[in-house]
Each structure stands twice: as structure tokens, then as C-alpha cells.
């Protein structure tokens, strides 16, 4: 194919968008970028009753968050109705389509008779014009549907980039309805006109569209268009092995942001959810674009693994800039009741994030760990009774005195802790646990010397001495 590469993502705005959906945007985006082509966003909103602006906004927001920028669009099918009607009129004029007056009840009865006879249920061509055929008289007051005049013989063939060579006999296909009685065009027809008008060269989409493909190819051929390369992606399964869907508990794309995942981690994970480059597990967006090809798309369903995504997210959090993570952590801190004013009273959030990020798998976890630096500690009474004993109080008093005089560095604080341990013949947990409780309000913190340095000398000494008073 010598045409410039043009790919598209064509979601229906009828609900939220999950990882399985957005993967059908990631791959055509990457292929367009790899081939220096054009990536088109098309909103297939002909299902007026189920489509919503809220769903469109969710699609746009999810793509923006993941950095899936489009070159053209969004193009809305509902804004192209005049074009569809123009093509329908041309097809009627050329005999490529015809009016069919068979009612839904008649069609149901026909299919039932076919099933009883052991035949495949299908439209029987009652209203299809043929040389020498006398058509029934159109019933009064009935508006017809329009049907595409599908070839009666021959085979539809395409070389699918994922499934290989696919052949479907035209005898298996009946004459597809392409417009409703009110003249509204049907999805399969609109898709063909759009792909033809937009010069789409590669259609990379879920394999739930495979059954539509032979019909779309026949319509495209009838209109004189050039069929694109098709790549039908296997289904994404959830952790229970079911098709990923909202009904089966799938999270929306933006729910991952709201849970504290980084977009680069989600993109990296999605890239590997149906495509591979050798054994590479971790790679940048730029590497993904450079390496991406259709030949290495998986042929089997890919199963979502939340622990794998969390592992990747932890990696990207460790690599991320502290200032960026601090900004991302602020909404989570705010949800914990810690606003900018509270943050201003404590240690620099960048530094706190730098300490917490090595232990976190999400930004939310960073915020939960950072919260202790911006709150008045309220340790559990039972924990205090367990750890702040009469036996350890003299050591706490000596430590407070040593910290008053020490240089305020991690090394000096560590030395003061070790000296106190030696003097009082204690092990580190016997001293570190009560210090953590009194200063931070919890026994779960990173390295005690690093934590104390961030709290600051005044806070640390004041809180220890207050407990001993």
C-alpha cells in the first residue's frame, strides 16, 4: 500500500471507556505515529438514544490523559447525515440498494420458518429487484428500509493483520439493511462512507467487529473505494477470564488516574496487553512508537492483571520527578483533609514525596504516607502503652537532649539514635517504635532517621518531650 497511513479510533459514546476500549485507540495511534501518518478521532454517535455528551467528554478526557493526541477530529457521524443520504441516493440510483417493505413481523415469521426447516435465518430477497422478477405491490402507508444489494456469488477475502487470510462466501451474507424507514442510515453503512471519505488505510479494532467486515468490504467495493488493511484485536479479558466490560466490574480509564496511577504506566501496560517486542516489559512511549508493528500483535485474548499494572506503576513512580508527584499528590491529600495551607506548615512536599515514593505503588499511597507530616499525631492508646514504657522513657529523654544539640542531618540523627541505643542497651525497634508513635502518630514509616530529619528538630524534640512531661 503506497497511500499515506491514516488510522482511526471510532468509539460509540454510549457509556464509560475502559482499558479494553482505549487499547483500540492506543494501537492505531502508535501505528500512525510510527509511520508518520494521520490519526483520526471519529465519534460514532448514530445511536441517539444511548449516546451522550458525557460519554464523549470521558473519551476525550481519557485520550488526553494518556497522551493519545489526534490529528483530525473529533468528527461526529450525526453531523455527516447529509453526506450519508447523498450516498444512499446514489446507491439507489445505481441499483446498489433497494427499498424493502417487509415488516419486522414478516421478517420474524420468515426466520422462524427457516429455523424450523433447519436453514440459517436470513432475509430471502423478497423485495430485491432482479431481471424478469415481478416485485410485490408496495403496501400503502408503509415506509421501507433500504437494503444493500449484496453479491449473490463469490467470496469476500481479506488478509487480516492479526487473523491471517479470512474468506467468507457471499452466500453466507444476506442483503444488509443500510437505512431505517425514517431514512436514518445504519452503523455498518456510515462506517464505510466515513472510512472511504477519510481515506482510512488501516482499521485496527476489536475482533467483535469481524462479522461486520465482509459486509463493509462489499459496500466499499460497490462504492468504488479501496478496502483498508484490517487488524482485528483479540478480546481483553478481566482477571476472572470474562470479557472486560462495565457489567463485569471494569474500571473506567479515568478511574485509574483517580486511584493514583501514572499515564505512562497505563500506556506501557496497555501496549503489552496484546502486543510484544521480544521480552521487553518496561519501555517509554517513544520506544513503543519506534517498535510498534502489526506483525507482533497477539492472536489470543489478553488477560488483565492488576498486580502487573501496579508493579509497572511503582516503577514509574520511582522514576518520576518529585515536584510532579507532589502536584499529583495534592488532590489526594486534600481528600484527607490536608489543604495547601496545611502543607505550608510542614516540610517541603517534594522532599516528603521523595522519601515516600520508593514504598508506594500509587500516588494515592504516597499521599496517605505523606499525611503524617501535616497532621498533629494522634497515636493509638494501646500502641502507646505497648511501646512508650517506663523502661524506655529515660532513653527517649536522652535522645531528645542529643537531638537538640546534633547537626540536623540524616547522618547526625542516625548517630544520635545509635548512641542512645548503646547507652541504654536497647535494640533499634525498642527506641524507633515509640519515637515513630510520638512524632508521626504511627509505627509504619520509612527509615526513622530520614523521617525525623523531614519533621524538623523543633517538631521532633517538642513531641518527644511533651510525651515525657
Swiss-Prot record:
User: Which GO biological process categories is it annotated with?
Assistant: glutamyl-tRNA aminoacylation
The residues listed in the UniProt record as binding ATP, with positions renumbered to this chain, are 246
Ligase found in the keyword field: yes
* Cellular compartment(s): Cytoplasm
- Which one of the record's GO molecular function terms can you name? glutamate-tRNA ligase activity
Q: Partners and quaternary state?
A: Monomer.
This chain belongs to the protein called: Glutamate--tRNA ligase
Which organism's genome codes for this protein?
Answer: Burkholderia cenocepacia (strain HI2424)
Amino acid at each position: 500500500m503506497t497511500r499515506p497511513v491514516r488510522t482511526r479510533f471510532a468509539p460509540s459514546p454510549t457509556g464509560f471507556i475502559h482499558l479494553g476500549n482505549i487499547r483500540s485507540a492506543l494501537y492505531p495511534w502508535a501505528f500512525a505515529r510510527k509511520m508518520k501518518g494521520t490519526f483520526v478521532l471519529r465519534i460514532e454517535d448514530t445511536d441517539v438514544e444511548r449516546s451522550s455528551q458525557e460519554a464523549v467528554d470521558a473519551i476525550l478526557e481519557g485520550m488526553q490523559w494518556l497522551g493519545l493526541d489526534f490529528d483530525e477530529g473529533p468528527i461526529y457521524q450525526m453531523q455527516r447525515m447529509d453526506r450519508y443520504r447523498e450516498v444512499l441516493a446514489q446507491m439507489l440510483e445505481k441499483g446498489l440498494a433497494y427499498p424493502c417493505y417487509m415488516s419486522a413481523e414478516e421478517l420474524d415469521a420468515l426466520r422462524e420458518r427457516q429455523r424450523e426447516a433447519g436453514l440459517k435465518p436470513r432475509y430471502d430477497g423478497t423485495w430485491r429487484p432482479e431481471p424478469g422478477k415481478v416485485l410485490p405491490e408496495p403496501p400503502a402507508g408503509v415506509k421501507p428500509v433500504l437494503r444493500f444489494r449484496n453479491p449473490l456469488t463469490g467470496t469476500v477475502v481479506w488478509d487480516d493483520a492479526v487473523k491471517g487470510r479470512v474468506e467468507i462466501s457471499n452466500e453466507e451474507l444476506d442483503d444488509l439493511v443500510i437505512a431505517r424507514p425514517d431514512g436514518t442510515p445504519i452503523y455498518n453503512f456510515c462506517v464505510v462512507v466515513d472510512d472511504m471519505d477519510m481515506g482510512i488505510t488501516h482499521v485496527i479494532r476489536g475482533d467483535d467487529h469481524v462479522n461486520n467486515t465482509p459486509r463493509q468490504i462489499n459496500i466499499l467495493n460497490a462504492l468504488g473505494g479501496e478496502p483498508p488493511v484490517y487488524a482485528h484485536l483479540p478480546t481483553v479479558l478481566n482477571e476472572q477470564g470474562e470479557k472486560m466490560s462495565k457489567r463485569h466490574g471494569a474500571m473506567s480509564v479515568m478511574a485509574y488516574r483517580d486511584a493514583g496511577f501514572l499515564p505512562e504506566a497505563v500506556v506501557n501496560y496497555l501496549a503489552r496487553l496484546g502486543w510484544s517486542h521480544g521480552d521487553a516489559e518496561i519501555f517509554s512511549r517513544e520506544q513503543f512508537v519506534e517498535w510498534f508493528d502489526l506483525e507482533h500483535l497477539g492472536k489470543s485474548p489478553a488477560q488483565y492483571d492488576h498486580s502487573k499494572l501496579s508493579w509497572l506503576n511503582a516503577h514509574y513512580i520511582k522514576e518520576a520527578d518529585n515536584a510532579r508527584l507532589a502536584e499529583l499528590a495534592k488532590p489526594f491529600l486534600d481528600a484527607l483533609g490536608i489543604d495547601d495551607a496545611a502543607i505550608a506548615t510542614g516540610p517541603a512536599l517534594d522532599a516528603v514525596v521523595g522519601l515516600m515514593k520508593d514504598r508506594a505503588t500509587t500516588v494515592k499511597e504516597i499521599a496517605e504516607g505523606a499525611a503524617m507530616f501535616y497532621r498533629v499525631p494522634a497515636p493509638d492508646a494501646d500502641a502507646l502503652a505497648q511501646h512508650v514504657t517506663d523502661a524506655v522513657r529515660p532513653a527517649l529523654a536522652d535522645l531528645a537532649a542529643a537531638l537538640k544539640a546534633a547537626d540536623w542531618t540524616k547522618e547526625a540523627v542516625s548517630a544520635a539514635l545509635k548512641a542512645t541505643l548503646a547507652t541504654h542497651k536497647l535494640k533499634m525497634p525498642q527506641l524507633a517504635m515509640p519515637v515513630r508513635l510520638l512524632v508521626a502518630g504511627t509505627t509504619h514509616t520509612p527509615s526513622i532517621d530520614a523521617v525525623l530529619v523531614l519533621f524538623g528538630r523543633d517538631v521532633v524534640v517538642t513531641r518527644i518531650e511533651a510525651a515525657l512531661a
